[in-house]
Each structure stands twice: as structure tokens, then as C-alpha cells.
């Protein structure tokens, strides 16, 4: 059974931005592999976009290099583990990564080598509650939100050393 949960985008401007990514990908010849449907009965006036899958996406294409922030998936082939890590780290962004493998050693290696703020192993978004720090690296976020790490941004640490004499 299908269990899809894809809500609307936040603004009309963002909807137009994502539609632009989709239109430019189609116009440039990137294969459209699948496109979902907007569910019946969604509220009128919502900024809904049908989930869309492209692939193979060329490595230099904007879908492979930019953050779309919409329901668009880019399938990018890779040769091996090292190539996958190199590909993931070659972007200017680093919010999070998802790795699917049964190999526990590979999970550990790749999670360590990924340049991003969060790594999900064999899941995506599971357990990402308020207790886990959230944030990216490079151009994807500043600092950490959620969890105890988020409080550090509001703190000024002061060290006081005092000598009381003999």
C-alpha cells in the first residue's frame, strides 16, 4: 500500500522556484522517471507540487548541485563507495545524508567521511526528534538547532581562575 505524506510548500515563491527546477530539468533533457499526483481533497490554494523523480541526473546539473527544497529526487549513479562519498561531498551544501547498506563497516566509514551535519543509516528522518542536534555544514546551516548543543549558541563561557594565597 502507498503511505505518502507530502504536504504543500511554504510560499507561492517557493512553489514557483521548485517548478522552475522541474521545468529546466525537463527542458535540458534530464529523464523524468516518475511523477506522483497531488492527493484528492487537498485544501484549495495550497502550494502543492507532485513528487518528481529524475535520473540519471548529470553531476554538473543544477539538480545535482543545488538545494531544491521541494519534492524532487535526483538519481545520480556512482561507481563505488569512494565515488559516492566524493560525489556527496563535492556540493556546496551539507545538511544531511542518507546511506542504505547492510554492511556495518561501510555504514561507519561512510558516515565518518560524509561532510554533513546529520547522517541517517538505513532510514531517513527517523528519530530526528528535539533531543538530537540538527544543523549542516558548508552553506547548509549555521550551528546546531535542537538538543543541548543548541543552547551553546545562547551561552558565553567564562573561565575564572582565582588564587586564594597560602
Question: Where does each model-flagged region fall?
Answer:
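Conserved C-terminal structural/oligomerization subdomain of aldehyde/semialdehyde dehydrogenase
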Residues: 38-41, 45-166
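Short secondary-structure junctions
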Residues: 29-38
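Short beta-strand to alpha-helix junction loop
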Residues: 9-19
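Helix-centric, low-specificity signal for extended rod-like, repetitive segments
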Residues: 7-10, 139
